[in-house]
């Protein structure tokens, strides 16, 4: 009988060293995010960059919605795997980080594939619903307090064979610790049920 391999820092480093190399602009985004202090935690991991790339490469979605842009690492990771006629729409309320993301998209020469909506996510989602937009893939990685709302509303935007990816559902492993009563941990735990 086999058992699951625990992924520690050594294993993670080994995987990173033997995986697909990041696009130079992905590396730049990561270096930029390193200067942001605690906000860096909003960034997806390198493994997630590879995962999002792989998902878009394998499933070839034509239309992607991302809820939560930050500085654009996840958008760029998905965009690199897309075919030429595919598009990403990404929503974020933060004008400053959205501008940073836009600049990185231009640098990577993918800005024509990515539309940024600067608005509260609920407003942006509702506008897309009113426009009857439909997406093959929806990636949710925004404020955790509204995950349930984003998830429920996303079904109004999802194509029949589409799928939803939700980041942070394990919340760095915190959700399994029943003694952890931190606010965001409880929200994620509730979302998962």
What are these regions (language model features)?
Residues 1-165, 169-193:
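A short alpha-helical cap/connector motif
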